Amino acid sequence: MSALAVEPEPARGDGWDELVRIWEETDAPEGCKVEIIEGIVTVAPPPANQHNSIAAKVHRVLIREIPEEWNVYQTLGLALPDRAGMYMPDLVVAPEAVVDEEPGNFVPAAVAELVVEITSKWNANHDRIVKLQAYATAAVPLYLLVDRWHSGRPTATLYGEPQNGLYRVLDAVEFGRDLHLPAPFDLTIDTSTFPLG
């Protein structure tokens, strides 16, 4: 992964606006993901085929079960100015009307009902630590971390009930077992279909 270093500034005011401007104007190769992580604009290469396959499988389950007024987004930017972050999660479930009404290329992270991140080998700690804390701080109700690189044992962990910037683990399974998402989703994801490696 390559990163374009940007001098960290306060998360609010001109510093945040400048970071967003750089993020919006970064001309990355097609398929690459541009994010702001802890005040640094980063460019990550396209995800691996297995990563995309997992995203497609989770997307398929979610789209069948979510309320009609919600949608599943694959390239929706989530703004977290208090954490100097602009993330592009693998999947976001959010109310369609809110996304449709928000101008620009991103929405406040707090509008998300569920965020799904699938780790890549070279930046897994962003998803495990930085984004976990940021989504909890933004009070995103559910965060599903699909960690293909977890200590040699791929896992899926569902975090929820955010309070004071911290999540509680609601469920954690190794690939091969079912993971249940509580209401308002009330659905099960079969991780045995997730490719390994």
Question: Where are the regions that the model predicts?
Answer:
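Gly/Pro/Ser/Thr-rich low-complexity, intrinsically disordered segments predominantly at protein N-termini
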Residues: M1-A138, L142-G197
